[in-house]
Amino acid sequence: MEKRSTPSLQITDRFGAQAAFASLRLPDGTEATVPAEHAAAIYVNEQPAFRVVCTPALLPQLALGRLLTEGWIASADEVEQIAVCAEGAKVQVYLRHPLPTRRAAAQEVASCCTDNIALGSPVELQPLRPVPGLALQPEWVERLTAAMHAGLPLYRATRAVHSCFVLHKGEIVFACEDLGRHNALDKAVGCAALAGLPLAECVLYTSGRGPMDMVRKAIRAG
């Protein structure tokens, strides 16, 4: 897996990964396995940016991916540190540069399918840019389709989450799950960015629909 050199990005995750699902007894006496839900607030340079409802895992990757795909940053190189508190309720992201005042202004904007809220003003975001052409090979699609059909662990247990795969040079290098397709994509992008992968050479394969906001996320990722 080819990587590019990046400035050191420090991650302090005191929360880690918690139980991904739980078994509940229904009124009729049967049991159902449901995914765990977790709420967290993402701050950028001490300013509130997003509130997310997600599965309780990969919070640093979710935060980094969200900033990339929403246009707050153009590269993971801009991030100096990501810190998650022990309860996982707050994710602090510190950039290597000040955050423009208007971008830090609090403004609640509904975002995607799990009650996520964007708290930052949607101005001064990174503009959309042309995406380099990537020749998609038929065998890549077959490999991704087979992996999606097989299902990831949380999906197999609950049948109630979305998945997103990252493919690089024909190999699946990351596979992420979450309650919402946007979160799953953000986690996948965050994983790839932390690994130093050239995102312009990667393929994202998602279980969710591909509406304009998801396409925009993929473009901003690279």
What are these regions (language model features)?
Residues E2-S163, L167-H168, F174:
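Intrinsically disordered, low-complexity regions enriched in acidic/Ser/Thr/Pro/Gln residues
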Residues I82-L99, L199-G222:
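Cysteine/selenocysteine-centered motifs that mediate thiol-based redox chemistry or coordinate metal-sulfur cofactors
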